[in-house]
Amino acid sequence: MLYKGDTLYLDWLEDGIAELVFDAPGSVNKLDTATVASLGEAIGVLEQQSDLKGLLLRSNKAAFIVGADITEFLSLFLVPEEQLSQWLHFANSVFNRLEDLPVPTIAAVNGYALGGGCECVLATDYRLATPDLRIGLPETKLGIMPGFGGSVRMPRMLGADSALEIIAAGKDVGADQALKIGLVDGVVKAEKLVEGAKAILRQAINGDLDWKAKRQPKLEPLKLSKIEATMSFTIAKGMVAQTAGKHYPAPITAVKTIEAAARFGREEALNLENKSFVPLAHTNEARALVGIFLNDQYVKGKAKKLTKDVETPKQAAVLGAGIMGGGIAYQSAWKGVPVVMKDINDKSLTLGMTEAAKLLNKQLERGKIDGLKLAGVISTIHPTLDYAGFDRVDVVVEAVVENPKVKKAVLAETEQKVRPDTVLASNTSTIPISELANALERPENFCGMHFFNPVHRMPLVEIIRGEKSSDETIAKVVAWASKMGKTPIVVNDCPGFFVNRVLFPYFAGFSQLLRDGADFRKIDKVMEKQFGWPMGPAYLLDVVGIDTAHHAQAVMAAGFPQRMQKDYRDAIDALFDANRFGQKNGLGFWRYKEDSKGKPKKEEDAAVDDLLAEVSQPKRDFSEEEIIARMMIPMVNEVVRCLEEGIIATPAEADMALVYGLGFPPFHGGAFRWLDTLGSAKYLDMAQQYQHLGPLYEVPEGLRNKARHNEPYYPQVEPARAVGDLKTA
C-alpha cells in the first residue's frame, strides 16, 4: 500500500502501474474537502515514485464519484471570498498535479461522474467508461459553475459548442453521447473495465498511443478562430438569456467566463474560473438552489425511512377516469404498478384511456419506448364499469367530482368491495379528510392523496393524514407515490391541506389588488418577470379554472372564515358569473385559441375589463414593490401558520411543497428560504405597512417573535473552517 486515506487509497496494480481507488465509507464516493486534501497527499506520494509508469483511477462503489459533497456547500459559501478563492486555488493545484504527472493516466469510470467527479476525470489523459455512465457538470443548477477546472478543460477537450451545452444547462450525458462528443475514449462492459483501462495504459506506456499529445490541448488556449468564437459564444449567450433569464446568474456567468478564458492557457484560464466562481457562491440564488437540493434529499430520505417496513402496493385502482384519473392510471402503470380504472360511464373511461395512450405515444415519439413497451404498459391499465378486480387491489385512489356527498358515497361503496386491509385515498384538493372519513367503517385505512395537474409532470403528491389515518396507511400511500416517481410530502388535515391553504390567500391578495384598481396584466407581469413565478395569478387562475377556484374559495372561506371570508364581490365571482371559466372554455382573464400544436394561446380580450370594472375601483398604478408585497404577504403568513399549527412538519417540507406543487421560484428557495434571506425583521416591517388591509396581512405571533430575536427558520449555518484547516480536514 502506497497511501491510505479515509476515502481513497493508492497501491501498485502491476509493473510500474499504480491504481488510485476512491472508496469512501458509505454507499457513494463524494469529492468533499477531506477527499480533495487526501487526493493531494496521494499525488504527493506518486510524485516520489521514480519507477511509476502509469496511473489508473477507479472506484470501489457502484458509481465513480457522484459529485462534490453538497452538504458542505452552505458553510463553504459563508467563507470570506478571499479564503474561498485560496481554497479553490489549492483544490485546482491538486488536479493540476494529477494532470501534470510525468506518466499517462486513465480514469476507469463506472456509473456517475458528476460535478467534481467529472472534473477529476477531465484531469486524466484517457477515460474508459461502462454503459451505465452519466457524466456531466450540473453546477449551474445549484447557482454556481464548475470550480475545479471543468470550465477550462471541457471546452478544450470537446470544443466550445458541446462543452457550453453541458456546462450552461447543467447537463449530464450517457455513455453513447459521451463517446460521440469525445468526453470518454471508449465504453466497455463493467467486468472488462479495469482490464480495458490497463490495456490502454500499456499502449500509452509503450508509445503506441501519444498521451502527451492527448494532454496538450488542455494546457493551451482554446482552438477557435475569431469568427467561430463569436458565433459559438453569441449563440450560447442568447440561448442562456432565453432559458435561464435574469434570475439565474450562473449559466451566463459560466458562458462569459469560458469566452474570456478562451485565449489563455490553463493557469490564467483557471484564475478566471476562480474569479467567477467565488462571487456566484455568495449569491442568494446559490444558497436557495443548494437549499432546494438539500431539502429534496431530506424529503426523499424521510419518505424512505417511513416506508422501510411496508410493502409497496403491487396492484392499484383509480375511481373516476377522465383527465385526472387517466393521468394517475398512466403514472402508476408507467412505473410498474398495474391499475384498474373504474368509472360509471363509458365516455369517461374512454377519455381516461385516451389520456394514458396520449402520454405513452409522446414517449414513443421521443424514442423513450418502442411499440412493444407501449403495448405492455397500456395493457396493465384495466378500464371497468364495475368493481371487477377490486378484491385484488392494495390501494384505491378516488378522483371523482369535488363534492363531499358524491365522494362519501363512492368511498363508502368501494370500501365494501375491497379487502379489509386495502387502503383508500381521496384525491380531493380542499375537502377535509376527516370529514370524508366519517362515511367509512375503517377510517384508519383512509387518507388523502392530492395529485397536481398535469399528473405526469408535477412532482408533488400531498399525503394527508386524517384524524384516524393509521401510520401503516400513510406509509403504504407514500410507498406508492414514491414508486410512481413522485415526491410525497405528508401533511396534517385541514381545509385545503397545505398547498391550497396557502395558495388561496395569495389569490385573495390578487383579488384585493384588483378591487383597489390594479391591472391584472401588470400584476401578472410583475409576479412573473420580477418575482419569478412561472405564471402570474390571473394566468394561473385561468389554467386552474375559474369555476374550480370559485368553488375552492368557498370551501376555504368556510374553513377559515376569520381570514378567508370576504365581504365583497371579487374578480373571481365576476368571471364565474359571466361563465368565463378560463382555458377550459376559452374565456377567462384572457381569451384562448389553440396554436398550431393544439395548445391554448392567450390573447387580449377587452370584454374582461368591462366585467372587472363592476367589482373594481377606478384604475390606478401600483409600484412593483407594492404588488409583490401585497401578493406574497398573505401566502407567507399562511405558510408560517401551517408550520406553527403542525399542518406541515418542517420548513424544508413546506418549501419543497411550494416549489414542486406551485412552481414557487426555485431561485428564492421557497417561502421560508425567501423569508430567511429577506430577514424576519425586514419582513415584519414590510408586512406592517399593509396590516390595514385585513386579517390576511396580520403577521403570526411566532413570526413576530422570530423578528424580535432576529432568528431564521432554517438552522444557522456556520462558515467552514479556515482554508488551512480545509486542506487537511
From Swiss-Prot:
Record's keyword terms, sorted: Fatty acid metabolism, Isomerase, Lipid degradation, Lipid metabolism, Lyase, Multifunctional enzyme, NAD, Oxidoreductase
Superkingdom in the source lineage: Bacteria
InterPro entries given in the database record: 3-OHacyl-CoA_DH_CS, 3-OHacyl-CoA_DH_NAD-bd, 3HC_DH_C, 6-PGluconate_DH-like_C_sf, ClpP/crotonase-like_dom_sf, Enoyl-CoA_hyd/isom_CS, Enoyl-CoA_hydra/iso, FA_oxidation_alpha_subunit
Active site: H450
Gene Ontology BP terms: fatty acid beta-oxidation
EC number: 4.2.1.17, 5.1.2.3, 5.3.3.8, 1.1.1.35
Amino-acid positions noted as binding substrate in the UniProt annotation, renumbered to this chain: D296, N500, Y660
GO molecular function, one term: delta(3)-delta(2)-enoyl-CoA isomerase activity
Known pathway: Lipid metabolism; fatty acid beta-oxidation
Keyword Cytoplasm: no
Catalytic activity: a (3S)-3-hydroxyacyl-CoA + NAD(+) = a 3-oxoacyl-CoA + NADH + H(+); a (3S)-3-hydroxyacyl-CoA = a (2E)-enoyl-CoA + H2O; a 4-saturated-(3S)-3-hydroxyacyl-CoA = a (3E)-enoyl-CoA + H2O; (3S)-3-hydroxybutanoyl-CoA = (3R)-3-hydroxybutanoyl-CoA
Pfam families: 3HCDH, 3HCDH_N, ECH_1
UniProt-annotated stretches for the region Enoyl-CoA hydratase/isomerase: 1-189
GO cellular component: fatty acid beta-oxidation multienzyme complex
Function of the molecule: Involved in the aerobic and anaerobic degradation of long-chain fatty acids via beta-oxidation cycle. Catalyzes the formation of 3-oxoacyl-CoA from enoyl-CoA via L-3-hydroxyacyl-CoA. It can also use D-3-hydroxyacyl-CoA and cis-3-enoyl-CoA as substrate.
Family (UniProt): In the N-terminal section; belongs to the enoyl-CoA hydratase/isomerase family.
Protein name: Fatty acid oxidation complex subunit alpha
Taxonomic lineage from the root: Bacteria, Pseudomonadati, Pseudomonadota, Gammaproteobacteria, Enterobacterales
